[in-house]
Amino acid sequence: FTDNILPNIFLPDLMAIKSWDPRTNTIIYNKKDFNQDTQTWIRDFGYPQTQIPSAQESFRVFMSEKLNFSQNKDTGFITISIKHQSPYVAQAWTELVVKEINYFFRVKDKAEAQTSMIFLNNQMAKTSLAEIRQVIAQLLQQKTQKMTLIEASNFYVFDYIDPPAVMEQKAEPQRAIIVVLGAFLGSILGMFIVLIRR
């Protein structure tokens, strides 16, 4: 997160967003946290926080409030979604997460395969037994196939079935439910107060 995702997102979009104006596609930031005019952080903070949100604090917010992974038990497909007031930011972050996960695992698996191939080539040079050389040759063939797969596609771990899109309908908050619940609770509270006064 710190090396691959955080440098590619605008931190106030994660840590200081108040709302999003769909007519102008403008993000409005919380004035208590971030000065949009000067592009500086002005938030109140207490130890261990800092004026500018740290990578750990940003990671906690991103993982607990923004990012969602779910797996369909029947198909095994994984759905990655981002919750954000701006659907454009949500789309961009979803694409970023998929790209960076693919990149991370491609680099990791490529390094492991290369190390294994070097080791196997060294073992092949050291041994004279035909049976062991045959086993090593099979292992080398498997590693070569893996290297080919790693290099062949940009979508190494995750591939899109349904690419990230700008959503037309809000996911949260559902204002109608909030209004109905507020009216219901207000009515109950009002009746309770009337009963207490009598």
Where does each model-flagged region fall?
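Beta-strand-loop-alpha "switch" segments that mediate conformational coupling across diverse proteins
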Residues: 1-8, 69-112
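Non-transmembrane alpha-helical coiled-coil
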Residues: 97-157
